[in-house]
C-alpha cells in the first residue's frame, strides 16, 4: 500500500531531459550512445516494454507498425533541448 499523499511544490533546476517510453504495439530498435555521441549498443523494444532514458544519446528506428507513449519532464523546449547528430547502423 502506498499511503495517500501530495507532492509539495518546489522550484527545481533541470539540467538534463529524461524520457520514458512505453511500447503499446509493434516494435522499434533503440540505439544507445555515450555523451560524446559514440555508439554503444542497440536493443529491440516490443509491445509492453518500458524504457527510461536518463543520460547519453539515443535514436529510434521503427521496425514493425509501432505505437508508443513518450513522457518527458518539462518544461521541454523542443529544438533548444535537443542536439541532433548523424549515425547509420551498418
Locate each region found by the language model.
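Short, charged/polar surface micro-motifs in flexible loops or helix N-caps
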Residues: 1-3, 25-29, 74
